[in-house]
Amino acid sequence: MGKQNSKLRPEILQDLRENTEFTDHELQEWYKGFLKDCPTGHLTVEEFKKIYANFFPYGDASKFAEHVFRTFDTNGDGTIDFREFIIALSVTSRGKLEQKLKWAFSMYDLDGNGYISRGEMLEIVQAIYKMVSSVMKMPEDESTPEKRTDKIFKQMDTNNDGKLSLEEFIKGAKSDPSIVRLLQCDPSSTSQF
């Protein structure tokens, strides 16, 4: 009796179909898996960090996972429900480049003011380095988080105001594929750094 139904209700399925790039069958399969891993229907930051650590066994992914979690948790209640999870997964795995860049921008914009400051960029880049630097050799001009942040700002901050707008971020990323790799937050693509 206390067991949650492992099928999505028709109205929820329709909402997710309209807001993701997944088929009905895929949505039902993801939902079953989500409930198996999160029987409460909600994922906490600690649970999320444990899952994320599996993708990066040789580094410390906890800080980066916190930033990803915050970006997934669109209603700010401190948990990720299935809707938040599947919409973010759709954007990051099947979204168009512009959607992915907007999502990444929202992750880097820590205070939500619509701009990425040098400090915000540095915090995320430091988290990435903690996660992957033990298994990756960085080029000399990106050998520290500070150098990588400087490189990103040099290329993207076109008006030199010390912060990146969404427009600068998207334009800069689109004009330089290596920047897309620098900003990449998809665990399966870290080898492309």
Curated annotation (Swiss-Prot):
Residues carrying lipid (N-myristoyl glycine): G2
Gene Ontology biological process terms, A to Z: regulation of signal transduction
Binding site for Ca(2+) 3: D157, N159, D161, K163, E168
Superkingdom to which the source organism belongs: Eukaryota
GO molecular function term, any single one: calcium ion binding
Cross-referenced PROSITE patterns: EF_HAND_1, EF_HAND_2
UniProt xrefs under SMART domains: EFh
Calcium is among the record's keywords: yes
Keyword field contains Calcium: yes
Keywords: Calcium, Lipoprotein, Metal-binding, Myristate, Repeat
Domain called EF-hand: residue spans: 41-58, 60-95, 96-131, 144-179
Binding site for Ca(2+) 2: D109, D111, N113, Y115, E120
Xref: InterPro entries: EF-hand-dom_pair, EF_Hand_1_Ca_BS, EF_hand_dom, Recoverin
Binding sites annotated in the UniProt record for Ca(2+) 1: D73, N75, D77, T79, E84
Family label: Belongs to the recoverin family.
PANTHER family: CALCIUM BINDING PROTEINS, HIPPOCALCIN-LIKE PROTEIN 1
Note: Probably binds two or three calcium ions.
Protein name: Hippocalcin-like protein 1
